[in-house]
């Protein structure tokens, strides 16, 4: 009940039928992020695509200019020199057959997964485990690569993977409530720009249809798409 009352109070002053400029929406969200922890600021982008069709899938990775405020644990599937390269770059978990076995047993001690191309026949066995978690390495988003150092540093430095969900929505954390407003605006615009660049050939009509921002415990605020894409 207390949470319901808090959310109701947080919604005061927000016109749920209105589209706000991005900067105004961020200010409103930050003012209402009053939890004892540093809430994550999240963005939801509704796209004019049907991801059930292969030619309308949208996914990619973007480096947010101001980071995410979150420290990711990175796992790397690699052998030999590439394994050492991953460790030197700051990977938290590095392995080959041994790491595959751990993951198969349900021991997933990382948030982002990277693999060298030669490891994919092994890693492919983990599709049923990593796939539903959105963690399966994929060359299209740079997580199957020989540049393991670059991929690890990117994951640690604020790169965000995005993928359209069944309802045609992309959701991503773009920073913390403690971030300055202009830093959050920059991060959201960087994400939106990457989503636009990832527009599939099969998309018809208006691509970016709706945008909303929210905090972990707070209400959503609808945003004028034009102020995000400008």
From Swiss-Prot:
GO terms for molecular function: rRNA binding; structural constituent of ribosome; tRNA binding. The gene is rplA. Keywords: Repressor, Ribonucleoprotein, Ribosomal protein, RNA-binding, rRNA-binding, Translation regulation, tRNA-binding. CDD domains: Ribosomal_L1. Pfam families: Ribosomal_L1. Disulfide bonds: none annotated. The keyword Transcription regulation does not apply. GO terms for biological process: regulation of translation; translation. Belongs to the universal ribosomal protein uL1 family. This is Large ribosomal subunit protein uL1. Binds directly to 23S rRNA. The L1 stalk is quite mobile in the ribosome, and is involved in E site tRNA release. The lineage of its organism: Bacteria, Pseudomonadati, Pseudomonadota, Alphaproteobacteria, Hyphomicrobiales. The keyword RNA-binding applies. One of its GO terms (cellular component) is cytosolic large ribosomal subunit. Part of the 50S ribosomal subunit. SUPFAM superfamilies: Ribosomal protein L1.
